[in-house]
């Protein structure tokens, strides 16, 4: 896969198709494969994605990760590719990065898609931040997955949102998650925008996708963007916990 360099860091990216440019950004702990597993090939769309800083095959530095930095990385990729106008979207953390990018570069973004937003002008819920911080603490340790199961917070995760357990355990098998473990502490404490007033300048077509029964991506976060982005359309998906295949098709 091709690489580009920004601020001394190499980023892995991929392009599929030759149509309208659509940059899609993955969630926390994931990688660019998500975009190509989610969207079918379409000759009318040029699907672009990158392993965001500290994810997949992309590098990172010692500085704190933030939505601002991730959005600047994504913008740097589009500048590198010579693409000056494009659609942008993302899942979870990627949705927040997409919103931040659209606010930073409203003159470049033709449209916005957010899928299961994980933060607004407020960070994740304190309970969820504690979950991710605990995972971050054990990722660099030997037998970290076992230590997580022995932590006092583990039963509350299992009781509140058992689906998160499988996600967290996968992190311990991912080299990028283990190497760049601090991202699981940094990002949940950050927020894509500082105030909802930043959204008033977004007049581009916006599609907001959400589903219920998701503690990490509460539906009220997506409704926040629906209320505060002028041209936003909203669609509620079937929750993955009810029908994962239908969720993916939608």
Where are these regions (language model features)?
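Conserved HGGG/HGGXW glycine-rich cap/lid loop of the alpha/beta-hydrolase fold
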Residues: 2-59
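Catalytic active-site module of serine/aspartate enzymes centered on a nucleophile-bearing elbow/loop
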Residues: 231-250
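Conserved alpha/beta-hydrolase catalytic His-Asp/Glu region
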Residues: 123-125, 141-190, 198
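Short beta-strand/loop motif that positions the catalytic acidic residue
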Residues: 202, 208-210
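Active-site loop/oxyanion-hole signature of alpha/beta-hydrolase fold enzymes
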Residues: 46-87
